[in-house]
Amino acid sequence: MATVTFDKATRVYPGSTKPAVDGLDIDIADGEFLVLVGPSGCGKSTSLRMLAGLEDVNGGAIRIGDRDVTHLPPKDRDIAMVFQNYALYPHMSVADNMGFALKIAGVNKAEIRQKVEEAAKILDLTEYLDRKPKALSGGQRQRVAMGRAIVREPQVFLMDEPLSNLDAKLRVSTRTQIASLQRRLGITTVYVTHDQVEAMTMGDRVAVLKDGLLQQVDSPRNMYDKPANLFVAGFIGSPAMNLVEVPITDGGVKFGNSVVPVNRDALKAASDKGDRTVTVGVRPEHFDVVELNGGAAKTLSKDSADAPAGLAVSVNVVEETGADGYIYGTVEVGGETKDLVVRVSSRAVPEKGATVHVVPRPGEIHVFSSSTGERLTD
């Protein structure tokens, strides 16, 4: 087990002037489960492959523990990698697949068998040790691939979208198994995914990348509560945070027919940048619907006393998930039509085509600079 350090690590592919990974700076603690997440092409898999030694590092350094491994070959890094496709040998049994790396390393048969059986017990694979991969389900094959990594007892686990080939239900159960297994083994793990739900549920910390640049690295809770910029705010959360550009008024921001109070330091910071508007972020669950007796509207001042409080939302689609309902609608802001998602009780879902008015709850507003995208509120 060991710490992992990306020290301004950079990768520029031949023939390109733009780095695929640009000055990546992350310190990963011993035994930590860190998830790299971002859209396709953001550099997350490239970062993992740089750590594995499968990609050259053109600038900066990578360290595992006290060792600088920047230019070491993969075999000398003491890492084990699990891929999206399981890469099992079809002609070998499960036991032979799991122990193959140890066999190549010259470990004696008795020790190999002992380590394979221990890993199989952890992964509930004991009864399948004599089977061939074709006789296993997708989830079982993925566990065999993990077992092959476990028996090597590496300092660092690397996982590159290992759940992508599994169906939705199996993905949920397997991700909980991987997270609990990592906590039991205590081995430092770097996990790559494009699925932010996976990232939020599995990682001790999450690192969000975009266009090769690190946007934010933090605990899942802090990242959800305090996204560093507009990209993170829109990427983390399902459904995503609503982002609406609204004008600054005295003491707050104009939200439809209501004035929502905002931290004065945030408004001053926006004014200092020359912004006349700010981008307000509100999670779907942090709206009150006026027509459903939402209490937040009563605390806000209104521009026009005879008009309903808040922002008028035209309901286009209603999704009912059983426990909750989600309103997918459109709003008119500054002459532009914007999409908005609001979570409501499944017992009080409006009709499609209806118009409802929404206001954000006090203290649940995120304010971002419209010009730079950076977070302005604490």
From Swiss-Prot:
Gene3D superfamilies assigned to the protein according to its UniProt record, in alphabetical order: 2.40.50.100, P-loop containing nucleotide triphosphate hydrolases
Record localization: Cell membrane
UniProt superkingdom: Bacteria
Induction: Constitutively expressed.
MF terms in GO: ABC-type transporter activity; ATP binding; ATP hydrolysis activity
Function of the molecule: Part of the ABC transporter complexes DasABC-MsiK and NgcEFG-MsiK involved in N,N'-diacetylchitobiose ((GlcNAc)2) uptake. Responsible for energy coupling to the transport system.
Protein name per UniProt: Diacetylchitobiose uptake system ATP-binding protein MsiK
Gene label: msiK
